[in-house]
């Protein structure tokens, strides 16, 4: 049963990634902001997240204000790409963080990251989280973004305490 469940999740993840890749860049930027808000970043405020991506956006596609005053901000970069993201793109994003006087960022792509990109984020003082297409869809499924529940099953077992005679 577990094997079948995992296959369904994998198939759903692949189908969901297909939908995300077909979406417009603007929709994708809004999606990543929505996802981080649903995950609890920005607290319960409705105005905590904003998609800001456009030409001349300085390499920032979205922002999440973690507190009411906006003193602590997470900056987002969203790339709806087929090719893997390299360390050059991550360095550019870190440069954008420096330009914003920020120290936290999340770089999300529909593809993946090169080994160099993964290694680069380990060497910098800025806190940058990389989310690839697989992790993106996993987080979307876990947080019910772009998916809906169809059916659920309760698996039961014998309650041996009930049958214990005194």
Set out the residue ranges of the language-model regions.
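Mixed-charge (Asp/Glu-Lys/Arg
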Residues: 1-166
